[in-house]
Amino acid sequence: MGLLWDFIITLLIIWPPYVANATPVVASKLFKRRTPIDFGRNFIDGRRIFGDGKTYEGFITGLLAGFVIGELTYIIVAKTVNITLELPAPLTVFIMCLAALLGDLTGAFIKRRLGLPRGAPAPLLDQLDFLLAALLALWLVQPSILRVIYVIIAVLITPPIHLATNAAAYLLGLKREPW
């Protein structure tokens, strides 16, 4: 069906990890108590492992929201589009959301090792850590769905989408930094 169809399928595939990655920002405003995943501990280099911004509350909320909203989206799309779509299976969606959040944690770990404080920009790492982890999970669990064009489109569109949504979150008072 062409590039437009590939673009739409790409958005559908990456939608659950996008939701999983964005939800912890909102969750941080909903929970009064936030428990850092690293429990405030430092790594062998003396720096925090992940930092205060990575919490169990955000991780769990992101995982659940990504899975539920992603699956609901797939159900709605499947019922409204008369074309058979091969989308990730429910277990794959869950694993992709988990991988996205683990990718984000990996990005935070790398930033701390580089001496970057919480909220400091790390171009491309900030925008692609979660996406690449989710796509890797999809490739490992349900490789028949992942086409090279979807990866290319996802990698090209994610940085501007990520920057735009972070700027919106900043303007809404959900984030301290616009990136």
Question: Where are the language model's segments positioned?
Answer:
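Interhelical loop and helix-boundary elements at the membrane-water interface
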Residues: 1-70, 74-136, 148-179
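Transmembrane helix interruption/hinge and helix-loop junction motifs
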Residues: 140-148
